[in-house]
């Protein structure tokens, strides 16, 4: 059996920008993407803690060390600058791999810098 499992998440990131007229996606600081093992164009789920919105999009790299979390395209209607979000990536695993897999959880501070690593 194959299972959809949480691979990683960036927990309680703060939206720094929203660009309604961009084609789509979420721009994430490259450092955070690497720590969370999220590749460019990888599908991610975004959960908005402020308003309960949930949506799927794909990740694109932001400037390394910038703390950028920018919601692009139509999803910009679901988040505002300053909103707290969780960004989750998933992987498909067989039962044995899923039982032993430890997801990466990246906690960030108010500037989207990793903490408690």
Curated annotation (Swiss-Prot):
Its cofactor is pyruvate. The keyword Lyase applies. The modification Pyruvic acid (Ser) is found at residue 25. It catalyses: L-aspartate + H(+) = beta-alanine + CO2. One of its GO terms (biological process) is alanine biosynthetic process. CDD domains: Asp_decarbox. Binds 1 pyruvoyl group covalently per subunit. It comes from the Bacteria. One of its GO terms (molecular function) is aspartate 1-decarboxylase activity. Its EC number is 4.1.1.11. Coiled coil: none annotated. InterPro entries: Asp_de-COase-like_dom_sf, Asp_decarbox. The keyword Cytoplasm applies. Is synthesized initially as an inactive proenzyme, which is activated by self-cleavage at a specific serine bond to produce a beta-subunit with a hydroxyl group at its C-terminus and an alpha-subunit with a pyruvoyl group at its N-terminus. The active site is at residues 25, 58. Its main location: cytoplasm. It is found in: Cytoplasm. Pathway: Cofactor biosynthesis; (R)-pantothenate biosynthesis; beta-alanine from L-aspartate: step 1/1. GO terms for cellular component: cytosol. Keywords: Autocatalytic cleavage, Cytoplasm, Decarboxylase, Lyase, Pantothenate biosynthesis, Pyruvate, Schiff base, Zymogen. Substrate binds at residues 57, 73-75. Heterooctamer of four alpha and four beta subunits. PANTHER family: ASPARTATE 1-DECARBOXYLASE. Belongs to the PanD family. Catalyzes the pyruvoyl-dependent decarboxylation of aspartate to produce beta-alanine. This is Aspartate 1-decarboxylase.
């Amino acid at each position: 059996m194959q299972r959809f499992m949480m691979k990683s998440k960036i927990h309680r990131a703060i939206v720094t920008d929203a660009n309604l007229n961009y084609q789509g996606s979420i721009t994430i600081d490259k450092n955070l993407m690497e720590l969370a093992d999220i590749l460019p164009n990888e599908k991610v789920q975004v959960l908005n803690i402020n308003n309960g919105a949930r949506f799927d999009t794909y990740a694109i790299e932001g400037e390394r060390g910038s703390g950028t979390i920018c919601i692009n395209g139509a999803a910009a209607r679901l988040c505002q600058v300053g909103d707290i979000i969780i960004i989750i990536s998933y992987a498909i695993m067989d039962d044995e791999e899923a039982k032993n897999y430890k997801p990466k959880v990246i906690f960030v501070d108010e500037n989207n810098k990793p903490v408690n690593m």
